[in-house]
Amino acid sequence: MLTSERSYLRYPKNRRWTEAGRFWAPHPENVLFIHKPTMEETRRVALGLRSQLVRNRERKTKAHLLSLELDRLVQVHDSRVRVINADIDAVKQMIGNMTWSDNIDMPQSRSHEPPLVTSPPQASHRNFTVAIVPGDPHFSVDRDLRGELMPTLYMNQNQWLPSFGPWFISLTDNAMQRRVFPKELKGTVNFQNSTSLKLISHTLTTVASTTADFFADARHLTDTQAALCLVNAYFCQKTSRQLPATPDDLLADLPQKLDLLITQLKQESGPGDFSFTYSNPQERASLAPLNKESRYPTAFFQRHKLHAMMAKAGLFPHNKGTGAPGTAPAMDLVFAITSAMFGSDIPPFSAYQWNLRAGIVALEVFILAYGLLEFGQVARGHPNRRLNLVSLLGPKFQPGALPDPNAPMLKRGQLFSFISEHYIIPTLQANPNAPVSFIFPGIILAALEARSTVSHKQPGPFVNLTGSRFNEIFEILNQQLTFRDPLALLQARTALRLATEEGLDVLLSHPSPPTLLQEIIKSQFGGGDDYDRAYFMVLGCLPVVLAVV
């Protein structure tokens, strides 16, 4: 091999750049220059164009959706107009087919005769009559027995004033000492061991509306209606009676239905009490289930004896795992009653548990009311009696209506049967939406007082001097008359209702609930016998005459 050939193989020849290679090759003269103002202006124009395109697209989308909604409204309106026109045509056809008689002489109006009033006054249809105790006179009521009775007690303020017992005296003193309290409720008579008419009226109104619904919902029943559905379903399940067919059937034989329920409840020996179980602290901020659900958590009713007894009887067949084998009815009795009485808008209690909770709490109030007067007697001239209607009502009280001293003893449950027939039924017939707190405000007050003493574990009697037991009531009055904050008012009413539920649990969990009730009524409200207890249960207070010094 030649020397030149070896050099060629060992050292390749240097390649030369092509025209394209020379263009892209690095060179000090190749400089990239960016003009910042031009780029900013380009960016601004591009963003403006993009925003305009987005707005145009959004405007077209909204216009399209609006046109669809308008088309739907036109279709709905057109269908409704067709229905209305069809009804009008049917009415016209019926009127055209009617036969008119020319022999009827229409009375001619005379100018000298006044026109006849063919309809009674508007308020007369609300007037009804109630009675509390056998032998006492009946009371003609327009709307509210308490609201119409209280003003009559303040007719002679220069001679005497009503006093309502230690609980109301303590409430009045505590209200006068509060820095924030509605001025219109601070009457001059508050400093004379009495309570002003405005303060006692607002307090009783607040207590009477404790269990009333905060808002309207087509699925809601009042707590009284829910309780009546529950007790009737349980009674029909245990006795194989026919389901109630009319609203009057719901109220018929109410003492017998409550007696059966209480008898079965006393036989329940399992663990538990009458409280609801809160697994989340936020559940106490609202009565409705959290997260807009229709059911409470599984453990919410777990400890409640009344719910457990009804579930064991098979009243809630939609709840899995409840009810003894072979005890469940062929259908949901509670749902059958609500559908027949209140329409198809009311869902089953097991599916929409707001009504279940409200009904159980109202049923607890009915149980306490029945137990308090189960063996009640109203003999004339009891030495420890506080209420004296003769001194309170004066000439309005008919002397001939006084109870007969030779009247026979009342049988077991007869006093509550009288109240059921002459007070509960007329009240619910006149006001079907009345909550149970409106019917028995005295039980609500006793429950609130029982709750305030539950934390005091004393071996003997004691006097509660703290003002914390009035906080829920005062907060509602402040929000209604002073601050007027709807959200705060809702929270205050929720707190009062929760406090009532806790107080009912304290009363029913006591070894002898009627005995504890009697002690509270006697020590805090002055009730000395069954006559006083019956009136306190209905009025929420026991006024007596107090001379003005």
Curated annotation (Swiss-Prot):
One of its GO terms (biological process) is symbiont entry into host cell. Residues 1-54 are annotated as: Interaction with major capsid protein/MCP. Keywords: Capsid protein, Host nucleus, Host-virus interaction, Viral genome packaging, Viral penetration into host nucleus, Viral release from host cell, Virion, Virus entry into host cell. Pfam families: Herpes_UL25 (PF01499). GO terms for cellular component: host cell; host cell nucleus; viral capsid. The keyword Glycoprotein does not apply. It is found in: Virion; Host nucleus. Disulfide bonds: none annotated. The keyword Membrane does not apply. InterPro entries: Herpes_UL25 (IPR002493). It comes from the Viruses. Heterodimerizes with CVC1. Interacts with major capsid protein/MCP and triplex capsid protein 1/TRX1 at the pentamer vertices. Interacts with the large tegument protein/LTP. Capsid vertex-specific component that plays a role during viral DNA encapsidation, assuring correct genome cleavage and presumably stabilizing capsids that contain full-length viral genomes. Participates in the interaction between the capsid and the tegument through interaction with the large tegument protein/LTP. Belongs to the herpesviridae CVC2 protein family. This is Capsid vertex component 2. It comes from Human herpesvirus 8 type P (isolate GK18) (HHV-8). The lineage of its organism: Viruses, Duplodnaviria, Heunggongvirae, Peploviricota, Herviviricetes. The gene is CVC2.
